[in-house]
Amino acid sequence: TSKIVKPALDAVKNGEIKIIPASGEKTYYHWLNNIEPWCISRQLWWGHQVPVWFDKDGNQYCAVTESEAQEQAGSDVQLTRDPDVLDTWFSSGLWPIGTLGWPEDSSALNQYFPTSTLVTGQDILFFWVARMIMMQLAVRNEIPFDTVYLHGLVRDAKGKKMSKSTGNVVDPIDIIDEYGADALRFTNASMASIGGVLKLDTQRIAGYRNFGTKLWNAARFASLNEANFGVSVPTAKETVNRWIVGETVKTLKEVNI
């Protein structure tokens, strides 16, 4: 494991890969420094089938293709392939290159690998992120990305992970039907934090809906009463003010339809 784990540890320690927020590094180091044996086979209907074949005596032959396994065993030996499939996290660990045509030397692989930033949840930092780093370094001797951005997790009002079995799942469609899409957007944007937990409480959503309604009513009142929107605004002189005006104009061009 040291041949696979150590390069992945070093990539973060020496700054090749940056984890944001930095607190995620502690979790990353903990998992890789205390790594346990991993059973990578699963008895599932779908997945990448384990590349191992057996003869009638139980001898096993690991190969990329069946023809290679047959060559190892001999042409007169009857082989049966292992019916198990690879664990999902093992298969997805090769996602950065597997989606780009690897193991072939494709144009897509040369163009898009490695990438720059991976945006993902903090809960799969080890299950997916660390394994992608380990596998790409082992297979390609390259890091798959240079930045890992851990976004927050949306949980229920008590901070518990949403689960169908628990019955605490909040359907955004139901929220939109009751409070409106803008209220849900406002709530998520106002509570967003890097790598944190967003406790989705309908009372908070209702509060932002009411606030948004006040803004809408005020704007509508001004519009109906012929408010003068053409008022002369003094020219910004300070650098920071000119920057604010410039950013506002750019935003208006992008979002004002």
Question: Model segments located where?
Answer:
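Structured secondary-structure scaffolds
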Residues: 1-229, 234-235, 241-257
